Regions:
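Short, basic interhelical loop/turn and adjoining N-cap
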Residues: 120-136
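Mobile genetic element proteins and their domesticated derivatives, centered on retroelements
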Residues: 29, 40-43, 80, 110, ...
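Residue-level detection of the helix-turn-helix DNA-binding "recognition helix"
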Residues: 45, 127, 138, 142
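Short, conserved DNA-binding cores of transcription-related domains
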Residues: 1-85, 91-92
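Short, surface-exposed linear segments at secondary-structure transitions and domain or protein termini
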Residues: 58-60, 99-102, 194-196
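Short, amphipathic alpha-helical "recognition" segments used to contact nucleic acids or chromatin
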Residues: 102-117
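RNase H-like nuclease fold core
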Residues: 132-196
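Short, Lys/Arg-enriched anionic-surface-contact patches
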Residues: 84-106
């Protein structure tokens, strides 16, 4: 009998249906949503997810045992009976963003990998394109800071990341350590000059 290993995904409201290792050595975990309702895309009323499934999407997730890991999900759909023309809405769960190729956890991981590293280095290490790293960076950093969510500004850090190897191509990341110990990105500045 083959040995089994159980690893928590730390993703809520899903059930694991299948796991497989593809021919190119990638771990693909097929999951299904357990959330029964969604908000209508037009009137925002809760509707039942009883209108089938959308097209399958594959999202890059945190590596498991050194393997590139992907979550495959067919999002549930619902049809609003209250709106004119009875539109359908496809479910988007809280652990990924619509049209993102990564889970939120993987985007946060990529942002941490950028500390003391370049985008090109992270791109090579993670087997991702340059634009995928930039996209993860843009998704993780809010355009505007909600200062009500910032609990503590006693510890502020400023770090620079090299966008490319060489000179004159840097961005500055401003972070703050919260009371619970988590690091929050406050801003990404276009360069490291004092005038910014």
């Amino acid at each position: 009998m083959a040995a089994e290993l159980k690893i928590p995904l730390d993703i809520s409201d899903v059930e694991v249906l299948d796991t497989e290792i593809s021919n190119n050595g990638r771990l693909i975990i097929t999951v299904e949503s357990q959330v029964e309702t969604i908000s209508c895309g037009i009137c925002h009323q809760p509707i039942s997810c009883n209108y089938g499934h959308g097209d399958p999407i594959k999202l890059r997730h945190l590596s498991v045992l050194g393997l590139e890991t992907y979550l495959r999900i067919r999002p549930r759909r619902g049809q609003c009976q209250s709106c004119l023309h009875e539109p359908t809405t496809t479910q988007v769960l809280d652990w990924y963003q619509q049209r993102s190729p990564h889970t939120r956890a993987y985007d946060a991981y990529l942002l941490k990998q950028l500390v003391n590293s370049t985008i090109e280095d992270v791109s090579l290490r993670e087997n991702l394109g340059y634009d995928a790293i930039i996209g993860a960076l843009n998704r993780q950093v809010d355009n505007k800071i909600n200062w009500a969510e910032v609990e503590d500004l006693r510890t502020v850090g400023i770090d620079e990341i090299a966008l490319k190897k060489g000179r004159k191509n840097y961005a500055a990341i401003v972070t703050g350590r919260q009371a619970n110990g988590k690091i929050r990105v406050l801003a990404v500045l276009p360069d490291r000059k004092k005038r910014v």
